[in-house]
C-alpha cells in the first residue's frame, strides 16, 4: 500500500486559533503563535491508510498505534520533554500535558496526563507506551481508575482527545527545528495537588528554532 501524507497539525492549529481569540495573556499568545507557525511548516508524518479510534478502545487503539509509524523512516531525536497545548471544547479550556520518558538510546516511553474537567485534577490517561526503532507498540494502557469514576461515554471522549493529540505531537518529534529545554523543578505539595497542579516535579518545554532558510526569530 502506498504512503499518503497526513497533516497531523491541522486540528491543533484550528483549536489554537480559538484559544488565541480568547487569550488575554499576550506572552502566552505569542508563544502559541510561534509554535503554530513552526508546526504548520514542519515535515509531516506519513501513514499508509486512515485509522480512527472506535468504540472498542483496546482493539482500535492498538491497531492505530501499531500502524502509526513507518518503521524505516522513524526518527525520534529527543528523549524527555513535556508540551502543554490548550484545547477548547464544549466545556471550556482543557490543558493537556504530554511527557516522554527516555530510558535508552532506542526507545521512548510515553505517558499522557489530561486535566479532568469535572474534578479539575490531572488524570494519567495512557499510562505507558513504547516507541522503538522497530515501530510503535503499546505496552500498557491503564484506564481502569477512570472507568470506576466516570461513565463510559465521558471516558471514551477523554481518551480520544488524549490519543489524538498524542499522535499529533509524537508525529512532530522528527522535525529538525524542534529542541528540548529543561525547566527548574517545582516541588508538589498537598495544597497544590488540591488545586489541580501539574503532577510532575520537573518540566520540559519545546524551544522552536527557525529553519536555516527562514527569517523568523527564535521562540
What spans do the regions from the language model cover?
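C-terminal, beta-strand-rich globular interaction domains
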Residues: 214-219
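Intrinsically disordered, low-complexity regulatory segments
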Residues: 1-211
